[in-house]
């Protein structure tokens, strides 16, 4: 079984070097750049050869530089019980996460669309959006059949993701504030439609 470079000797020093490379990449991303391993190495004052021991390619670096949001819920301790209010709070919080690190999220979106990308890590990160939506809709677990709830989660995920934000801003020409308003409206509309549909008796 092979051992990674970072797991051999001088781990503290290697952890600091890796952190410096990641921070350099994040700083470059905030400036609108899509940093290569070489560019991050220069910015972090690390040799090119050393940088490649930590990140084999640009994608590995960019995945590491992507901001981590580890929380299992975007709702606070005093979260409302109403599903629509909960969903709106999650959409608003998620939009703020996107806007605070927009360039990084745009980069991850581009990577996910590139042919030949390693989708394992990318898919794992995108999956958090679904967890947060399910958390918002938790009060509906006993109200909607599992299949209908799953369909609603998928529909909302499409309407409020970074993909939606990029489309509304870049293609529709909306301001970011207006784009977020549309995302919130879309989520509410989908929820109300699902609830109305479930209330209609089947023949």
What are these regions (language model features)?
Residues 1-46, 59-60:
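Basic, helix-initiating cap at the start of DNA-binding domains
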Residues 27-34, 63-90:
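Amphipathic alpha-helical linker/stalk segments
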Residues 43, 75-103, 123-126:
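Hydrophobic alpha-helical connector segments
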Residues 49:
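Key DNA-contact positions within bacterial/archaeal DNA-binding proteins
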Residues 52-63:
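HTH DNA-binding helix-turn interface
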Residues 65-69, 99-120, 134-135, 166-167:
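Amphipathic alpha-helical segments used for helix-helix packing
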Residues 96, 100, 116-146, 150-154, ...:
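Amphipathic alpha-helical packing segments from all-alpha helical-bundle domains
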Residues 140-186, 194-203:
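Hydrophobic/aromatic-rich alpha-helical bundle segments in the mid-to-C-terminal region
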């Amino acid at each position: 079984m092979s051992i990674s470079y970072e797991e051999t000797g001088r781990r503290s020093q290697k952890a600091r070097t890796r952190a410096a490379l990641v921070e350099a990449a994040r700083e470059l991303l905030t400036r609108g750049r899509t940093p290569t391993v070489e560019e991050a190495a220069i910015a972090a004052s690390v040799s090119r050869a050393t940088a490649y021991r930590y990140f084999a390619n640009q994608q590995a670096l960019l995945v590491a530089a992507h901001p981590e949001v580890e929380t299992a819920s975007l709702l606070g301790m005093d979260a409302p019980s109403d599903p629509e209010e909960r969903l709106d709070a999650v959409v608003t919080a998620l939009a703020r996460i996107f806007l605070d690190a927009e360039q990084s999220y745009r980069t991850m979106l581009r990577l996910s669309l590139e042919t030949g990308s390693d989708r394992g890590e990318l898919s794992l990160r995108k999956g958090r959006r679904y967890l947060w939506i399910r958390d918002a809709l938790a009060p509906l677990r006993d109200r909607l059949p599992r299949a209908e709830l799953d369909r609603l989660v998928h529909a909302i995920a499409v309407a409020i993701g970074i993909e939606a934000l990029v489309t509304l801003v870049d293609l529709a020409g909306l301001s970011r504030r207006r784009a977020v308003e549309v995302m919130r409206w879309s989520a509410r509309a989908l929820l109300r439609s699902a609830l109305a549909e479930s209330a209609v008796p089947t023949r």
